[in-house]
Swiss-Prot record:
Protein name: Large ribosomal subunit protein uL13
Protein species of origin: Lupinus luteus (European yellow lupine)
GO molecular function: mRNA binding; structural constituent of ribosome
One Gene Ontology cellular component: cytosolic large ribosomal subunit
Gene symbol of the encoding locus: RPL13A
Cross-referenced SUPFAM superfamilies: Ribosomal protein L13
Keywords: Ribonucleoprotein, Ribosomal protein
Domain of life: Eukaryota
InterPro entries the UniProt entry points to: Ribosomal_uL13, Ribosomal_uL13_CS, Ribosomal_uL13_euk/arc, Ribosomal_uL13_sf
Pfam family, one: Ribosomal_L13
Gene Ontology terms describing biological process: negative regulation of translation; translation
Membership in a protein family: Belongs to the universal ribosomal protein uL13 family.
């Protein structure tokens, strides 16, 4: 994803792990308005500056808005994907046709569901915690905050992510072994061909 200048691809998959919520949302909102399709994965690991207790109290005050007919059915969802989606919506003129179409180009997920687990994932340097948050400053994860205010799937997502990482490690080890065998085969072939490679070198074969 190219921030602020042009469309990089048909669809960009962004790994949101350890990105700052507001900074990532502002960059994504700008890209959506430029026509870019964006998929956000691992939204439960987005960071918010400030300690967990402070953020929980702020969010609970925000969640006090309820329906009169059914108080448990408030207008605000507590899942990390919905919190990020709502943050981006606040940065887009979503009541216009342009804003409505821009918001439709955004997909947000907890964890990394198929088929995005096998696709190349990008990061946004301008929103990374390690570059944007001062050293020693408190922060909390969006998944932790959501689990404190009513989201029930934090442990489920962590378990699914653990299984996905185990599968990825098996694939990586297999690929590394195949690369070793390929390098060894190339060395054996070079030793066998020897002088023939010197003849083929001038014609760039």
């Amino acid at each position: 994803m190219v921030s602020g200048s042009g469309i990089a691809a048909k669809r960009v998959v962004v790994d949101a792990r350890h990105h700052m919520l507001g900074r990532l949302a502002s960059i994504v909102a700008k890209e959506l308005l430029n026509g870019q399709k964006v998929v956000i994965v691992r939204s439960e690991e987005i960071c918010i500056s400030g300690g967990l207790v402070r953020q929980k109290m702020k969010y609970l005050r925000f969640l006090r808005k309820r329906m009169n007919t059914k108080p448990s059915h408030g207008p605000i969802h507590c899942a990390p994907s919905k919190i990020f989606w709502r943050t981006v919506r606040g940065m887009i003129p979503h009541k216009t046709k342009r804003g409505e179409h821009a918001l439709a180009r955004l997909k947000v997920y907890e964890g990394i569901p198929p088929p995005f687990d096998k696709q190349k994932r990008l990061v946004v340097p301008d929103a990374l915690k390690v570059l944007r948050l001062q050293k020693g400053h408190k922060y909390c994860l969006l998944g932790q905050l959501s689990s404190e205010v009513g989201w029930n799937y934090y442990d489920t997502i962590k378990e699914l992510e653990k299984k996905r990482k185990e599968r990825s490690q098996v694939v990586y080890e297999r690929k590394k072994q195949l690369n070793k065998l390929r390098v060894k085969a190339e060395q054996v072939a070079q030793e066998k061909l020897g002088s023939q490679l010197d003849i083929l070198a001038p014609v760039k074969y």
